[in-house]
Amino acid sequence: MPDYEFSPASGDRPRSWISKQVLIVLGVCLPVILALAIWVGVLTWRQSSMGATDHVSAIVLGRCLTYTRNMHPELRNQDCKKILNTFTSAFVSKDPCNITKEDYQPLIDLVTQTVPCNKTLFWSRSKELAHQYSGIQKEMFTLEDTLLGYIADNLVWCGDPRTSEVKEEFCPYRNENCSSTATSVFWTVVSQKFAESACGTVYVMLNGSRTTAFSKASTFGSVEVFNLHPDRVHTLHAWVMHDIGGVERDSCLGSSIKELKSIVNQRNISFFCQDDYRPARFVQCVRHPEHPSCSVLM
Ligand code: JS2
């Protein structure tokens, strides 16, 4: 078979040339497509999970000792090792999407701390300012100023049925397919206990620079308000704070506060509301002394 090649007339190319082009294109595209698929896969997985806090057990134990040995020595008899084991037993080796309130009951029963009457400060969408305020008004307690809130603040944790270890890498995000995560159930349980143990006049710091300062969907609006005991709590004071230089989207005259007032009054608890409660405004103004809404205070 003479091996002669036709010189290609303009336009039609020999098959081998085309197959080479195809191979080159495939050679280039396939890895790109594969990389894209892997990247999307990782992204979706990342979206369904979030980083668990590294060394949660060590952090919880350390915070417990710091809190009970030098911040609140009156609690020095609390057994921090037992608190840690009781905390982790609530979620290790369990389905991280089906943790129950009962799982945390042994921890709630173990840690006994009473907040003095008239010293409970709730917050909603104003965590930083509430903590700055209670950091100055040291007799006031947010949940994170109590032992259980302090040991877990800003941590993420979960377990896994396949291991008795506390997960170090990723934990499932709380969403419709995974509604009862170890972290979210913990905050619901300790928020409920924090509200149940409140007495006298209690306070809530709300954010009037958000569309609705009060939301029934929030932990404060769905758990804490409904676990205040009217025979122990006679008054709720709301402070609607606005960001310095921020927009005033809601206030004590707003519809969301009217809703809060009616819920609280229906529970036979008196309700008062102040916009930009002055002492908390002072705390905000420490960081913005030049702002006109602060210079008037000086
Ligand atoms: C703290 C966390 C975390 O009154 C406050 C506190 O007592 C708190 O437990 O619940 C109230 C705030 O929750 P709310 O009203 O839903 O306000 P938010 O600004 O939307 O806060 C959402 C987070 C509340 C529960 N929570 N609290 N430290 O690390 C933490 N993680 C979660 N999920």
Swiss-Prot record:
The active site is at C117, C199. Gene3D superfamilies: ADP Ribosyl Cyclase, Chain A, domain 1, NAD(P)-binding Rossmann-like Domain. Disulfide bonds join C64-C80, C97-C178, C158-C171, C252-C273, C285-C294. It is a single-pass type II membrane protein. Residues 1-21 are cytoplasmic. It catalyses: NAD(+) = cyclic ADP-beta-D-ribose + nicotinamide + H(+); 2'-phospho-cyclic ADP-ribose + nicotinate = nicotinate-adenine dinucleotide phosphate; NAD(+) + H2O = ADP-D-ribose + nicotinamide + H(+); nicotinate + NADP(+) = nicotinate-adenine dinucleotide phosphate + nicotinamide. The keyword Glycoprotein applies. Pfam families: Rib_hydrolayse (PF02267). The chain crosses the membrane at residues 22-42. Osteoclasts. Residues 43-298 are extracellular. One of its GO terms (biological process) is intracellular signal transduction. Keywords: Cell membrane, Disulfide bond, Endoplasmic reticulum, Glycoprotein, Hydrolase, Membrane, Microsome, NAD, NADP, Signal-anchor, Transferase, Transmembrane, Transmembrane helix. Glycans are attached at N98, N118, N177, N207, N268. One of its GO terms (molecular function) is phosphorus-oxygen lyase activity. Homodimer. Synthesizes cyclic ADP-ribose (cADPR), a second messenger for glucose-induced insulin secretion. Synthesizes the Ca(2+) mobilizer nicotinate-adenine dinucleotide phosphate, NAADP(+), from 2'-phospho-cADPR and nicotinic acid, as well as from NADP(+) and nicotinic acid. Also has cADPR hydrolase activity. PANTHER family: ADP-RIBOSYL CYCLASE, ADP-RIBOSYL CYCLASE_CYCLIC ADP-RIBOSE HYDROLASE 1. This is ADP-ribosyl cyclase/cyclic ADP-ribose hydrolase 1.
